[in-house]
């Protein structure tokens, strides 16, 4: 029987490499009763959404993921091209020039293959997400046939199936827009050539799935799968790999927030109110079940060291190694940090660095902002990294900073000497070159902006450590709530029976970081407060989870951010003193914006398989 079950798992809903993501043929040639009559067999079938991998791929290869974690932003970034999605925005540059074609508005064949090809170097996101959706649909349709499942097992399995289906559709909608939302396994006589829903409709359907998942998990007693803080089992056990009821409610709020956003909004303030109510529920629920923001001294544990904190509602941990034997981290960490000869890295632009306020809460994004901060005695453009938001040093590697792997008086050196050479930096007793002549290589991963990414780096060299993708965490819950409430009720508005105002929610995130409240001049009304909400989100969630890539699109701010000039920071030692000069990046590294760039196009050969499936516009 065991041998039979294994062979059935290999066929039932688990398409091979030749299976199209739109191939919904139900003729699988097996008897389903061999799977769904027992809880153990049904669970073994369903849990492939978490554990399934590509066959024939080398152990340790990130491309082995053929499960829901392929949708995890960090796994998507750990690709053969070594570009994170942040280099497709104004937030970052990359050492390897090839990744900049997307920023220039060219979604070429290479990147189409990256998203859709079932190849060792590909991320066939469409195929895998629709395979997962099919597994969820078959599980939901057959779960009542289990003869030996307890009510808790039955409800938890249904909850997970609804959650994973919603998460798969949410992922597809973020990158490609609205989808046909299939909730049943289609039969031979069913209509499977379905039209696309709008993005608004798709996000609302995702929210419905997340809401259903919450109700089932509540009934199953799986609102949290590990022990509460201070009790045995906290942050331990295999159960944390699976989403729980708190996560489902949080994702329901996020999906409704995306539906309400400017890119998708259909019903005005009522969409925002609906999102705010659920976001309020998520905050309350998270608190009841022991989730809270970590102290700022532990903030980085959300991203490295880990694998778990009580701030993470759901996270994916990946073992990275900062030496030349592991190129997977090179999408985030540039060559001086990981010694991978082709490491591209995510190198923050000066534009994004300017989003980090002074420690007094002064904005620095515009020349007028900086002049005002200088006049207040809060900013010095020749000592630009002093007196900044504490999260700046935890997010960005800049000249003159110390990292954990340095010793004594050792600091990171990015400046240039007057003779044109660059001093090395000592990290874990190794000499590393962070400063480098700009634009000298199209493949080397040295920064052209004067900055490197700190958030996912343990500050050491030649060490193994966990890099963590916090798919959703508590700080985001407050930011989601603040944004939704502000849009229908202003800074002093509330929702969901909470006394917490939109302004309070933002200030709570700032307080954890050691920052003062938002300055009063920015809290008069919805319109003046909105930019500070956006900025707080950009700072707190910087370079994680594709947040900025997604947020700048749903906010429709790309028309401004992707048409501005991008800058770096040049630092030269002159007469024993460092001189800081902003400079424009070369034209080849400047962004372009076209309306079609809100979504990626599907490959024509896939989209054409369905007559009613209208493709997105091509970028080229």
Predicted regions mapped to residue ranges:
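Short coil/turn linking the two alpha-helices of tandem helical-hairpin repeats
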Residues: 173-174, 178-180, 221, 258-267, ...
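Conserved, well-structured interaction surfaces
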Residues: 38-44, 51-57, 91-177, 190-204, ...
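Glycine-rich, aromatic-lined ligand/substrate-binding cores of catalytic
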Residues: 310, 314-431
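Membrane-proximal, proline-rich intrinsically disordered regions
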Residues: 19-76, 383-386, 607-620
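C-terminal substrate/ligand-recognition segments
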Residues: 385-509
């Amino acid at each position: 029987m065991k041998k039979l079950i294994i062979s059935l798992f290999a066929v039932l809903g688990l398409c091979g490499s030749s299976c199209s993501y739109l191939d919904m043929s139900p003729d699988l040639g097996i008897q389903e009763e061999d799977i769904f009559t027992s809880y153990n067999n049904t669970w073994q079938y369903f849990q492939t959404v978490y554990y399934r991998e590509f066959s024939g791929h080398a152990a340790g290869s990130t491309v082995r993921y053929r499960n829901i974690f392929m949708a995890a932003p960090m796994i998507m970034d750990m690709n053969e091209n070594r570009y994170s999605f942040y280099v497709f925005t104004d937030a970052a540059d990359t050492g390897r020039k090839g990744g900049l074609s997307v920023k220039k508005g060219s979604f070429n064949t290479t990147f189409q293959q990256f998203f859709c090809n079932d190849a060792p170097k590909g991320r066939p996101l469409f195929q895998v997400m629709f395979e997962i959706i099919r597994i969820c649909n078959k599980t939901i349709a057959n779960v009542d046939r289990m003869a030996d499942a307890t009510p808790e097992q039955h409800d938890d399995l249904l909850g997970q199936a609804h959650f994973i289906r919603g998460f798969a559709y949410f992922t597809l909608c973020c990158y490609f827009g609205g989808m046909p939302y299939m909730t049943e396994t289609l039969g031979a006589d069913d209509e499977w050539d379905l039209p696309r829903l709008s993005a608004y409709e798709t996000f609302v359907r995702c929210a419905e799935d997340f809401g259903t998942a919450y109700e089932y998990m509540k009934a199953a007693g799986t609102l949290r799968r590990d022990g509460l803080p201070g009790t045995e089992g906290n942050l331990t056990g295999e159960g944390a790999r699976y989403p729980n009821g708190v996560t489902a409610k949080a994702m329901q709020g996020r999906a409704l927030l995306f539906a309400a956003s400017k890119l998708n909004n259909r019903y005005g303030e009522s969409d925002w109110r609906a999102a705010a109510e659920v976001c309020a529920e998520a905050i309350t629920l998270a608190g009841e079940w022991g989730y809270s923001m970590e102290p700022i001294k532990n903030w980085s544990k959300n991203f490295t060291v880990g694998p778990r904190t009580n701030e993470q509602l759901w996270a994916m941990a990946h073992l990275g190694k900062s030496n030349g034997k592991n190129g997977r981290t090179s999408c985030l960490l540039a060559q001086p940090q990981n010694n991978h000869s082709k490491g591209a890295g995510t190198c923050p632009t000066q534009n994004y660095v300017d989003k980090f306020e002074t420690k007094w809460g002064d904005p620095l994004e515009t020349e007028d902002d900086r002049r005002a901060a200088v006049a207040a005695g809060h900013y010095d453009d020749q000592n630009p990294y002093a007196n900044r938001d504490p999260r700046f040093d935890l997010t960005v590697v800049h000249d003159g900073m110390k990292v954990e792997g340095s010793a004594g008086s050792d600091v990171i050196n990015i400046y240039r000497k007057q003779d044109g050479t660059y001093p090395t930096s000592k990290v874990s007793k190794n000499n590393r070159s962070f400063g480098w002549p700009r634009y000298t290589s199209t493949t080397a991963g040295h920064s052209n902006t004067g900055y490197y990414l700190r958030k996912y780096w343990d500050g050491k060299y030649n060490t193994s450590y966990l890099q963590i993708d916090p798919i959703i965490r508590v700080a985001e819950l407050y930011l989601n709530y603040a944004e939704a409430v502000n849009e229908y009720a202003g800074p002093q508005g509330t929702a969901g029976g909470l006394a917490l105002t939109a302004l309070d929610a933002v200030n709570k995130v700032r307080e954890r970081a050691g920052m003062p409240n938002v300055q009063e001049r920015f809290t008069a009304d919805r319109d003046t407060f909105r930019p500070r909400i956006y900025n707080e989100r950009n700072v707190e969630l910087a370079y994680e989870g594709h947040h900025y890539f997604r947020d700048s699109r749903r906010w429709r701010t790309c028309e401004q951010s992707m048409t501005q000039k991008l800058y770096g920071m040049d630092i030269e030692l002159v007469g024993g003193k460092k001189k800081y000069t902003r400079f424009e990046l070369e034209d080849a590294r400047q962004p372009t914006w076209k309306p079609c760039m809100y979504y990626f196009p599907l490959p024509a050969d896939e989209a054409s398989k369905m007559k009613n499936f209208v493709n997105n516009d091509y970028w080229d």
